[in-house]
Regions:
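Pyridoxal 5′-phosphate
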Residues: 1-185
Length: 185
């Protein structure tokens, strides 16, 4: 389930969705790509089974991300590929894999990507998610008040629980033309 919708900024009620899913025995993966760099996430309080995010969404490198998973679920999952560091012991008769997370880390890891991701997370932590969230909220209010007088402008994504994302359409204008104009200016 998506924590925060990228196009509208809607903050989905993941805590309630997780509780309902768990009531039926369904594990839940939370896509936190849009929420991780903007709002604090307590995976244990949410009772999320898995949480994922992309490195580039937290101002880090592309091609790397993170997966949180409950230990018992990760231990129950088989490795999906083979390679050096993930193997505890190998004989002609059998292969014994290391425990999680090592059993999912075949071959040479993306060391440069991991260092870059760590630096990006350190930066976010140094600025502070509350400060980032407050600044983004101020920018959203400023933009909305500045655009309020544009004839035919209609905001999209006005959920009560919402991140600082502003989507809109302008009556009589092609969306791509508006986006192209804004991109140039």
């Amino acid at each position: 389930v998506t924590h925060v919708a990228n196009a509208l900024g809607t903050v989905n009620p993941v805590r309630e969705i997780i509780a309902l899913s768990h009531a039926y025995g369904v594990p839940v993966l939370v896509d936190a790509a849009q929420s991780t760099p903007h709002i604090p996430i307590d995976v244990q309080s949410l009772d999320a089974d898995f949480v994922v995010f992309s490195g580039h969404k937290v101002f880090g490198p592309t091609g790397i991300g993170a997966l949180y998973g409950k230990k018992h679920l990760l231990e129950a999952m088989p490795p999906w590929q083979g390679g050096g560091h993930m193997i505890e012991d190998v004989t002609f008769a059998k292969t014994v894999y290391k425990g999680a997370p090592e059993k999912f880390e075949a071959g040479t890891p993306d060391i440069a990507g991991a260092v870059g991701l760590g630096a990006a997370l350190d930066y976010l932590e140094s600025v502070g998610l509350p400060a980032i969230s407050a600044y983004e909220h101020d920018l959203l209010e400023y933009a909305q008040s500045g655009l309020a007088d544009i004839k035919g402008l209609r905001l999209i994504g006005t959920a009560r629980e919402k991140a600082s994302v502003m989507s809109f359409v302008i009556e009589g204008q092609q969306n791509e033309a508006v986006a192209h104009h804004l991109d140039r200016h």
